[in-house]
């Protein structure tokens, strides 16, 4: 659908800074933009800053878990707050749920957000609606909610199918369960399913990497994002590794 996909908020922020003058704040630029009727294609991004299990390599801030139970209401309030701006009245070509892990919300919370999304905005018939998830959150109930809400793309954070690697990286469930979750998502009708894979983590061998790639080939996924492990200070995996191990990464 698009020629380029920004992989992180860092990339998106860099592009945003090119859009407004140095004398103008980001807030005033966004306010001005929302009050204009432009012909460019529209994308909505919804952020869910929660995870049911924190990856051992994750350096990001964790918000108060007590906020999670009401977070869908916050998203719905925000949608209603901006949907009447002239800029948002045009058809929406794509919707991206990122995080965090958006499917860390309860199925009924996700259902409420997806339902209200179509109430607030004119979602184009061919719009890509993409949700990030981990393997363990893709239960039959969650998949049913996503399909009902029009989700047609999934990005699943697998990282590795190797059981020892999954334990080291703080992923829940076995590699076999992760592969089953990917298959189930595709079989549910979300053919545009992609996964994230991490390489160059401690203990990974060429044989383990080749085994991961063999599983991937068998799944029939639509895309693969392949990243090296980036070691951040103050993360569990950083403290677990010795100085010599850290120096090799």
Task: Annotate each predicted stretch with a short phrase.
Residues 1-44, 53, 88:
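Flexible, acidic/Gly-rich N-terminal and inter-domain linker regions that tether
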Residues 3-8, 56-60, 116, 186:
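A broad, low-specificity signal for short, low-complexity segments enriched in glycine/proline
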Residues 31, 35-38, 55, 97, ...:
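General secondary-structure edge motif
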Residues 40-73:
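Canonical Radical SAM [4Fe-4S] cluster-binding loop centered on the CxxxCxxC motif
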Residues 62-87, 92-249:
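Conserved non-cysteine loop/helix-boundary elements of the Radical SAM core domain that shape
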């Amino acid at each position: 659908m698009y020629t380029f996909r920004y992989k992180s908020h860092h990339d998106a922020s860099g592009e945003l800074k090119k859009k407004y003058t140095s004398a103008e704040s980001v807030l005033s630029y966004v306010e001005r933009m929302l009050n204009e009727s432009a012909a460019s294609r529209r994308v909505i991004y919804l952020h869910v800053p929660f995870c049911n299990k924190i990856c051992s390599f994750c350096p990001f801030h964790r918000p108060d878990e007590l906020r999670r139970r009401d977070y869908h209401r916050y998203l719905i309030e925000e949608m209603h707050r901006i949907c009447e701006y002239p800029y948002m009245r045009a058809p929406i070509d794509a919707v991206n749920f990122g995080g965090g892990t958006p499917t860390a919300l309860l199925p009924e919370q996700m259902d409420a957000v997806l339902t209200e999304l179509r109430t607030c905005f004119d979602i184009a018939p061919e719009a890509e609606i993409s949700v990030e998830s981990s393997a363990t959150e893709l239960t039959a109930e969650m998949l049913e909610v996503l399909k009902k809400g029009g989700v047609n793309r999934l990005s699943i954070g697998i990282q590795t199918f190797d059981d020892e690697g999954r334990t080291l990286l703080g992923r829940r469930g076995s590699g076999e369960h992760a592969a089953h979750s990917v298959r189930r998502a595709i079989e549910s009708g979300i053919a545009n399913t992609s996964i994230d894979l991490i390489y160059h983590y401690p203990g990974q061998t060429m044989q383990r990497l080749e085994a991961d790639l063999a599983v991937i080939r068998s799944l029939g996924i639509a895309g693969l994002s392949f990243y090296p492990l980036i070691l951040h200070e103050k993360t569990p995996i950083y403290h677990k590794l010795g100085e010599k191990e850290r120096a090799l990464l």
